[in-house]
Structure formats: structure tokens, C-alpha cells
Amino acid sequence: MAFTGTGQVSSSTGAFEQMAYFALRSNPLYEMIADVRSTAQTHNGASVTFDIYDNMAAATGALGEAVDVVPVALGDSTAVVTLVEYGNAVETTAKLRGTSFLNVDADAANIIGYNMVDSLDQVVAAVAAGGTNDILPTGRAATVNIIAGDTITADQTRTAAAKLRTASAPGFENGNYVGMIPPNVAFDLRSQTAVTDVIAFQIRQDGQAVRNGSIGTWGGVEFIENPRAHIQAGAGAAGIDVYDTVIAGRQALAKGFSRAPGFGEQPQIVYGPTTDYLRRFVSVGWYHLCGYSRFREACLQRVESSSSL
């Protein structure tokens, strides 16, 4: 008796899922703290300069009845944002588009769109972490002295909020500051169990934050766990990584961009022209002419720590 099985015919094949899956992604978050934008730009240029007037010293002395005041000169400072080009692109071939069971063009546009926000958010993260105000672990004089056991403490975050308030840094919603914290560091902050620490506070509330495994708003800071948070690779003692938690108020960062026709505040998706003779090659990419800079150093605090994970 002759059986007809998979070895006798070619109609038995492996199947493919026709929906494409993409690599895991995180949301772009740093752009939100670059809230200063040019609104009355004089002309198109390679940089955008923002002028900031200084406050006058308080006049607390009593005036003499017959003595005129002495005029005081005003002072100012500037923040300069240099515009640079950012972008990326992919190009597909006609043979791929004609033989793939997936919609390659649509998938390429999807991937390019995420690459755009991912890339720009990392640019902003590096600028935010480059501020001059840092809060080191107790007993450490510099980043290079941070050891593996120097995980973040509640005191460091409270110190950051206190310094921002001392500098009159304006807050975001409900007057709270925003803290971009690496997930590894957030784990360490939630692991502390003293009565003045995060987890003890949350347990005394309704416990929802504990169930969610999030910090939320605490100590005047709305913490957002961000995998793009800046890491100083190998910058600590014995080459350990140092993690930066950036705590910011409003006007911490500024964004500049070109206002010329065809440019703008937001990046753009660009479909390239088909220029080969047989029109086989199709490209899609993104482009942005912009720049980011720290606008008010007093509105930024960087908490440095190691991670136990």
C-alpha cells in the first residue's frame, strides 16, 4: 500500500504570520522638559539666542528724605541653541517589495517613525544630564569616586527638590518637578524601607502605587521611569556605571529650530524621490534641523548613583 505524505508532495509548507511585530519600544519623554521655544525669532539663522534679564538686588534700605537714589545698571545673560541636522533613512528594493508577504513600505515607515522619536529623545537626554548641578552620594567628592554600593537615597531626591525651590525654579503640574529616573535606580529607591522612604509612605496611603510598582509623585517630584535616562558608562570607581536621575523644573531646557519654509518645530517624515532608471529603489526617512540647550541651569539637578541591578 502506498501512502501519500509530506515527503511525497510539495504542498505542505511552513506558515507565516502576516502581521509584523516590532522590537520593544519606550515612549519619548525628555522632549517635555524642553519647554522653552522660540516664538518671535528675528530671522533664520544657524543658532537661536535667548536673552535672560538678571534680577536686581533687593533694595531693603530706607531712603533718605532728601537723598536721591543711585540708578543701578541692568544685567542679562544669554542661552544659545545651535541648530544641527538630524536624520536617518532606509531604502527598499523592488524585488523585496514584490516578493515579501509583508507590507515592507508600511513597516519601514513605522520603524523610521520610532527611530525619529527615539533618536531625538536621546539627544535631549544627553543635554539634560550635562548640567552643572549634581548631587553625589554622601561622602563622594566626584563621579569617579562612586562605588557599587552608592545606590540612590531618598535624601538625594529631597535635596534636589529643595535646591530647585531655593533657586525659585518653577514646577510643572501642581507645582511638582519632573524626575527622569532609570528603572534600575527606581528599583533601588523603592527598596528603601525607612519610615521616611518612598515605600513606607505609599503603604500608609491606599497602596495603589505599591501594587503598580511605581514611585509616582513623592517629595515634590513626579518621577517617570525612563529607559533612556542617561548613564555614564564606566565613570565610577573600578569602572562601574553611574546612573543619572535628572530632576527638572520648567524652563530647564530650550529648543531651537528653523522657521524657514519647509522646516519647523517638529521633525518630518521624508519620502525620497525615485531617481533610478527602472524606479526600483524607494526610500523613506526622517529629518529635523533643530538644537537643544540648557536654558536655566538653576532649574536642573542631576542625582548620581550606582545601581544594585
Features from the language model and the residues they span:
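Alpha-helical scaffold segments that mediate packing/assembly in large oligomeric complexes
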Residues: 99-169, 302-304, 308
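N-terminal "assembly arms/tails" that initiate or stabilize quaternary assembly
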Residues: 1-82, 300, 304
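Sequence/fold signature of self-assembling virion shell proteins
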Residues: 2-33, 147-158, 191-309
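Short, solvent-exposed loop/turn elements at domain surfaces
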Residues: 57-61, 188-189, 232-233
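Short acidic, glycine/tyrosine-flanked loop/strand segments centered on an H-E-D-like triad
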Residues: 73-100
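Short, structured patches in soluble enzyme cores that scaffold and shape functional sites
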Residues: 94, 181-185, 193, 288
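Short, surface-exposed beta-edge/turn micro-motifs
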Residues: 47, 174-178, 281
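Extended amphipathic alpha-helical segments with heptad-repeat/coiled-coil character used for oligomerization
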Residues: 165-182, 187
